[in-house]
Amino acid sequence: MKFDNVIIMTDIDGTLVTDEKKILDKDMKAIERFRSGGGTFTLATGRGYSMAKPIAERIGLDVPAVIFNGSAVYDFSADKFLWHSGLDSYAETVAKELIEAFPDIAIEILCEDKVYVPSINRIERAHLALESVQPILCSVDEIHEESWLKMLIAYPPENIHRIIDFVQSRPEYVSCAHWVRSENHYYEMLPIGVNKGSGFQRLLEIMGRKDAFTVGVGDYNNDIELIRDAKLGVAVASAQQAAKDAADLIVCDNNSGAISEVIEYIEKL
Protein backbone atom coordinates (compact mmCIF):
# COMPACT_ATOMS: atom_id res chain seq x y z
CA MET A 1 0.00 0.00 0.00
CA LYS A 2 1.14 3.51 -0.78
CA PHE A 3 1.49 5.73 2.25
CA ASP A 4 -0.08 8.92 0.90
CA ASN A 5 -3.59 8.26 2.23
CA VAL A 6 -2.52 6.54 5.46
CA ILE A 7 -2.70 8.14 8.92
CA ILE A 8 -1.02 6.32 11.79
CA MET A 9 -2.04 7.44 15.26
CA THR A 10 -0.09 5.83 18.07
CA ASP A 11 -0.16 5.81 21.83
CA ILE A 12 3.11 6.96 23.44
CA ASP A 13 3.72 5.10 26.71
CA GLY A 14 3.97 1.35 26.31
CA THR A 15 3.73 1.64 22.52
CA LEU A 16 5.89 4.26 20.77
CA VAL A 17 8.45 4.58 23.57
CA THR A 18 10.34 1.83 25.36
CA ASP A 19 10.00 1.14 29.06
CA GLU A 20 12.91 3.61 29.49
CA LYS A 21 10.84 6.27 27.65
CA LYS A 22 13.11 6.22 24.58
CA ILE A 23 12.22 5.96 20.89
CA LEU A 24 14.23 3.25 19.16
CA ASP A 25 16.35 4.26 16.17
CA LYS A 26 14.65 1.61 14.02
CA ASP A 27 11.26 3.15 14.82
CA MET A 28 12.49 6.69 14.06
CA LYS A 29 13.90 5.56 10.71
CA ALA A 30 10.63 3.81 9.85
CA ILE A 31 8.61 6.92 10.78
CA GLU A 32 10.85 9.08 8.59
CA ARG A 33 10.47 6.63 5.69
CA PHE A 34 6.71 6.56 6.17
CA ARG A 35 6.44 10.36 6.13
CA SER A 36 8.79 10.75 3.17
CA GLY A 37 6.42 8.43 1.30
CA GLY A 38 3.51 10.76 1.99
CA GLY A 39 2.16 9.14 5.15
CA THR A 40 0.82 11.07 8.13
CA PHE A 41 2.11 10.10 11.56
CA THR A 42 0.68 11.45 14.80
CA LEU A 43 0.01 10.74 18.46
CA ALA A 44 -2.90 9.82 20.72
CA THR A 45 -1.79 10.05 24.31
CA GLY A 46 -3.09 10.38 27.81
CA ARG A 47 -0.33 12.88 28.45
CA GLY A 48 -1.07 16.56 28.62
CA TYR A 49 0.60 19.25 26.53
CA SER A 50 3.73 19.66 28.66
CA MET A 51 4.35 15.92 29.02
CA ALA A 52 3.72 15.14 25.34
CA LYS A 53 5.78 18.03 23.96
CA PRO A 54 9.23 16.36 24.27
CA ILE A 55 8.00 13.36 22.26
CA ALA A 56 6.33 15.60 19.68
CA GLU A 57 9.62 17.46 19.27
CA ARG A 58 11.63 14.23 19.13
CA ILE A 59 9.63 12.92 16.16
CA GLY A 60 9.27 16.34 14.51
CA LEU A 61 5.49 16.21 14.70
CA ASP A 62 4.08 18.37 11.91
CA VAL A 63 0.35 17.61 12.24
CA PRO A 64 -2.09 17.94 15.18
CA ALA A 65 -2.23 15.26 17.88
CA VAL A 66 -4.76 13.93 20.37
CA ILE A 67 -3.78 14.56 24.00
CA PHE A 68 -5.41 14.13 27.44
CA ASN A 69 -6.79 10.72 26.33
CA GLY A 70 -9.05 12.36 23.76
CA SER A 71 -10.06 15.50 25.65
CA ALA A 72 -8.12 17.76 23.29
CA VAL A 73 -6.61 18.11 19.83
CA TYR A 74 -3.40 20.12 19.93
CA ASP A 75 -1.19 21.55 17.18
CA PHE A 76 2.37 21.44 18.54
CA SER A 77 3.83 23.23 15.50
CA ALA A 78 1.46 26.19 16.01
CA ASP A 79 1.53 25.77 19.80
CA LYS A 80 -2.25 25.98 20.22
CA PHE A 81 -5.34 23.96 21.05
CA LEU A 82 -7.60 23.26 18.08
CA TRP A 83 -10.36 21.72 20.19
CA HIS A 84 -10.93 20.56 23.75
CA SER A 85 -13.64 19.23 26.04
CA GLY A 86 -13.79 19.77 29.80
CA LEU A 87 -14.98 17.74 32.76
CA ASP A 88 -18.33 18.37 34.40
CA SER A 89 -18.05 20.85 37.28
CA TYR A 90 -18.97 17.98 39.63
CA ALA A 91 -15.38 16.76 39.17
CA GLU A 92 -14.35 19.19 41.91
CA THR A 93 -16.63 17.41 44.38
CA VAL A 94 -15.35 14.03 43.22
CA ALA A 95 -11.74 15.08 43.80
CA LYS A 96 -12.47 16.34 47.32
CA GLU A 97 -14.40 13.21 48.29
CA LEU A 98 -11.71 10.89 46.95
CA ILE A 99 -9.01 12.72 48.92
CA GLU A 100 -11.14 12.50 52.05
CA ALA A 101 -11.86 8.79 51.57
CA PHE A 102 -8.30 7.85 50.56
CA PRO A 103 -5.72 10.10 52.28
CA ASP A 104 -2.87 8.24 50.50
CA ILE A 105 -4.30 8.86 47.02
CA ALA A 106 -2.59 11.02 44.40
CA ILE A 107 -4.75 13.23 42.22
CA GLU A 108 -3.51 15.16 39.22
CA ILE A 109 -5.74 17.77 37.58
CA LEU A 110 -4.68 18.48 34.02
CA CYS A 111 -5.69 21.79 32.48
CA GLU A 112 -4.60 23.36 29.21
CA ASP A 113 -1.04 24.24 30.19
CA LYS A 114 -0.85 23.49 33.90
CA VAL A 115 -0.77 20.40 36.10
CA TYR A 116 -2.28 20.74 39.58
CA VAL A 117 -1.63 18.15 42.30
CA PRO A 118 -3.94 18.53 45.32
CA SER A 119 -2.86 15.18 46.78
CA ILE A 120 0.44 13.36 46.21
CA ASN A 121 2.03 9.98 46.93
CA ARG A 122 5.22 8.14 45.96
CA ILE A 123 3.78 6.94 42.64
CA GLU A 124 2.89 10.49 41.63
CA ARG A 125 6.29 11.83 42.73
CA ALA A 126 8.05 9.23 40.57
CA HIS A 127 5.76 10.01 37.64
CA LEU A 128 6.39 13.76 37.84
CA ALA A 129 10.15 13.24 38.14
CA LEU A 130 10.26 10.87 35.17
CA GLU A 131 8.32 13.27 32.96
CA SER A 132 10.22 16.36 34.24
CA VAL A 133 6.96 18.11 35.06
CA GLN A 134 6.74 21.02 37.50
CA PRO A 135 3.30 20.68 39.10
CA ILE A 136 1.38 23.23 41.13
CA LEU A 137 0.87 21.74 44.59
CA CYS A 138 -2.33 23.18 46.04
CA SER A 139 -5.73 22.28 47.42
CA VAL A 140 -8.70 21.60 45.15
CA ASP A 141 -10.24 24.92 46.22
CA GLU A 142 -7.14 26.76 45.01
CA ILE A 143 -7.52 25.54 41.43
CA HIS A 144 -9.13 28.43 39.56
CA GLU A 145 -9.36 27.05 36.03
CA GLU A 146 -12.36 27.30 33.73
CA SER A 147 -11.89 23.79 32.43
CA TRP A 148 -10.36 20.60 33.81
CA LEU A 149 -9.49 18.44 30.80
CA LYS A 150 -8.99 15.30 32.86
CA MET A 151 -8.30 14.01 36.34
CA LEU A 152 -5.68 11.32 36.89
CA ILE A 153 -5.63 9.14 39.99
CA ALA A 154 -2.42 7.34 41.00
CA TYR A 155 -2.60 4.51 43.53
CA PRO A 156 -0.66 1.29 44.24
CA PRO A 157 -1.69 -1.31 41.63
CA GLU A 158 -2.38 -3.97 44.23
CA ASN A 159 -4.99 -1.72 45.86
CA ILE A 160 -6.32 0.42 43.01
CA HIS A 161 -9.41 -1.79 42.85
CA ARG A 162 -10.51 -0.03 46.05
CA ILE A 163 -10.61 3.28 44.17
CA ILE A 164 -12.38 1.73 41.19
CA ASP A 165 -14.99 0.04 43.40
CA PHE A 166 -15.53 3.30 45.31
CA VAL A 167 -16.12 5.23 42.07
CA GLN A 168 -18.28 2.60 40.39
CA SER A 169 -20.53 2.28 43.46
CA ARG A 170 -21.53 5.94 43.15
CA PRO A 171 -24.00 6.60 40.30
CA GLU A 172 -23.36 10.35 40.52
CA TYR A 173 -19.66 9.73 39.73
CA VAL A 174 -20.36 7.32 36.89
CA SER A 175 -23.03 9.47 35.24
CA CYS A 176 -20.91 12.61 35.01
CA ALA A 177 -17.77 11.20 33.37
CA HIS A 178 -16.04 8.48 31.38
CA TRP A 179 -13.75 6.46 33.68
CA VAL A 180 -10.85 4.41 32.34
CA ARG A 181 -7.83 2.57 33.68
CA SER A 182 -4.81 3.76 31.69
CA GLU A 183 -2.01 1.91 33.52
CA ASN A 184 -1.96 -0.64 36.31
CA HIS A 185 -1.55 2.23 38.80
CA TYR A 186 -3.62 4.92 37.02
CA TYR A 187 -7.39 5.49 36.89
CA GLU A 188 -8.73 8.49 34.96
CA MET A 189 -11.81 10.69 34.88
CA LEU A 190 -12.57 12.04 31.40
CA PRO A 191 -15.45 14.06 29.94
CA ILE A 192 -18.48 12.00 28.90
CA GLY A 193 -18.07 10.58 25.39
CA VAL A 194 -14.34 11.27 25.32
CA ASN A 195 -11.72 8.65 24.48
CA LYS A 196 -8.81 8.30 22.07
CA GLY A 197 -11.09 6.95 19.35
CA SER A 198 -13.40 9.97 19.51
CA GLY A 199 -10.32 12.20 19.61
CA PHE A 200 -9.00 10.55 16.44
CA GLN A 201 -12.32 11.21 14.70
CA ARG A 202 -12.24 14.84 15.82
CA LEU A 203 -8.70 15.20 14.45
CA LEU A 204 -9.73 13.68 11.10
CA GLU A 205 -12.57 16.20 10.87
CA ILE A 206 -10.23 19.10 11.64
CA MET A 207 -7.73 17.90 9.04
CA GLY A 208 -10.41 17.13 6.43
CA ARG A 209 -9.15 13.55 6.21
CA LYS A 210 -12.28 11.51 6.98
CA ASP A 211 -11.57 9.23 4.01
CA ALA A 212 -8.02 8.34 5.07
CA PHE A 213 -6.90 4.79 5.79
CA THR A 214 -6.59 5.01 9.56
CA VAL A 215 -4.22 2.97 11.71
CA GLY A 216 -4.53 3.01 15.51
CA VAL A 217 -1.76 1.54 17.68
CA GLY A 218 -1.85 1.01 21.44
CA ASP A 219 -1.38 -1.20 24.45
CA TYR A 220 -3.80 -0.42 27.28
CA ASN A 221 -7.51 -0.14 28.06
CA ASN A 222 -7.53 3.58 27.22
CA ASP A 223 -6.43 2.60 23.68
CA ILE A 224 -9.31 0.21 22.98
CA GLU A 225 -11.53 2.68 21.08
CA LEU A 226 -8.53 3.97 19.10
CA ILE A 227 -7.65 0.41 18.07
CA ARG A 228 -11.23 -0.75 17.49
CA ASP A 229 -12.38 2.25 15.45
CA ALA A 230 -9.37 2.44 13.10
CA LYS A 231 -9.46 0.69 9.74
CA LEU A 232 -6.38 -1.19 10.91
CA GLY A 233 -6.25 -1.63 14.68
CA VAL A 234 -2.91 -2.71 16.12
CA ALA A 235 -1.89 -3.83 19.61
CA VAL A 236 1.67 -4.46 20.76
CA ALA A 237 2.65 -7.87 22.14
CA SER A 238 2.88 -6.45 25.66
CA ALA A 239 -0.66 -5.03 25.48
CA GLN A 240 -3.52 -5.77 27.85
CA GLN A 241 -5.72 -8.61 26.62
CA ALA A 242 -8.68 -6.28 26.06
CA ALA A 243 -6.56 -4.16 23.71
CA LYS A 244 -5.41 -7.27 21.86
CA ASP A 245 -9.00 -8.45 21.53
CA ALA A 246 -9.90 -5.15 19.83
CA ALA A 247 -7.02 -5.39 17.35
CA ASP A 248 -6.74 -6.67 13.79
CA LEU A 249 -2.98 -7.12 14.14
CA ILE A 250 -0.56 -7.91 16.98
CA VAL A 251 3.04 -6.73 16.55
CA CYS A 252 6.16 -7.02 18.73
CA ASP A 253 6.38 -5.23 22.07
CA ASN A 254 7.32 -1.59 22.63
CA ASN A 255 10.94 -2.49 23.42
CA SER A 256 11.46 -4.30 20.12
CA GLY A 257 10.38 -1.87 17.37
CA ALA A 258 6.58 -2.10 17.26
CA ILE A 259 6.11 0.99 15.09
CA SER A 260 8.62 -0.14 12.47
CA GLU A 261 6.77 -3.48 12.28
CA VAL A 262 3.45 -1.67 11.77
CA ILE A 263 4.90 0.39 8.92
CA GLU A 264 6.46 -2.69 7.29
CA TYR A 265 3.06 -4.42 7.47
CA ILE A 266 1.31 -1.48 5.78
CA GLU A 267 3.92 -1.49 3.01
CA LYS A 268 2.98 -5.07 2.18
CA LEU A 269 -0.78 -4.48 2.00
Q: What annotation goes with each model-predicted range?
A:
Residues 2-7, 24, 188-269:
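Mg2+-dependent phosphoryl-transfer enzymes with acidic/Ser/Thr/Gly-rich catalytic loops
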Residues 12, 47, 218-220:
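Active-site metal-binding loops of divalent metal-dependent hydrolases
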Residues 27, 52-56, 163, 167, ...:
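Hydrophobic packing residues within well-ordered alpha-helices of enzyme cores
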Residues 59-61, 69, 77, 175, ...:
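Short, structured coil segments at secondary-structure junctions
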Residues 38-42, 62-63, 149-150, 212-214, ...:
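Short active-site oxyanion
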Residues 20-124:
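Active-site phosphate-binding/coordination module
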Residues 9-17:
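Generic N-terminal amphipathic, Lys/Arg-enriched alpha-helix
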Residues 104-217, 221, 226:
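Conserved acidic, metal-coordinating active-site core of Asp-based
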